[in-house]
Amino acid sequence: MARYCGPKNRIARRFGANIFGRSRNPLLKKPHPPGQHGMQRKKKSDYGLQLEEKQKLKACYGMILEKQLVKAFKEVINKQGSVTKMFLERFECRLDNMVYRMGFAKTIFAAQQLVSHGHVLVNGKKVDRRSFFLRPGMQVSLKEKSRKLQSVQESLENRDEGSLPSYISVDKGNFKGELLVSPEQDQIEAQLPLPVDVSVVCEFLSHRT
């Protein structure tokens, strides 16, 4: 499965936030956006703002691909309910993101690797598809051998219990977590490393799908 392999520090500097949770904050050394004219801020057009919000959303979930963004929007556009909430939920409830939220990985990229390398179980069965969509009641756990990984143990030890979303439960001792309920939009937005106007992203995609 394709994944982003580009410079992550440049992305963080572009949005002015350590969005990938790196231990060495790239903004401490270079707080301004990348590029020759990084310190100059130009006024963006409406189209430019839409593009920026879209890129911010993609970055928040580990640089998801454009086609994944479009696919998620198509899946919810004709459903009853809040399109922005259902659209955002498509990314929040991805398996790789749930592994990250539950504290089994320090970063979203580490979570992606855990899933892709076959370390993760869903309801007791191996799932190596990062975009697998979790529904309420589904349990996420790690294989017996995978629980001994130093990166996993360190991540769980350093996990702040207070930062665990209310729609997730985690049993550290058994390396297991569960999605309790479908998260509300404001709950999801509270977990994002930087603010994203999801309605603007949906408006952008509505003209291109």
From Swiss-Prot:
GO molecular-function term, one example from the UniProt record: rRNA binding
Region described as Disordered: 23-46
Record key words, sorted: Ribonucleoprotein, Ribosomal protein, RNA-binding, rRNA-binding
Keyword rRNA-binding among record annotations: yes
Domain S4 RNA-binding: 93-156
Statement: the UniProt record of this protein carries the keyword rRNA-binding: yes
GO BP of this protein: ribosomal small subunit biogenesis; translation
Family: Belongs to the universal ribosomal protein uS4 family.
Subunit description: Part of the 30S ribosomal subunit. Contacts protein S5. The interaction surface between S4 and S5 is involved in control of translational fidelity.
Protein name: Small ribosomal subunit protein uS4
Organism: Chlamydia caviae (strain ATCC VR-813 / DSM 19441 / 03DC25 / GPIC)
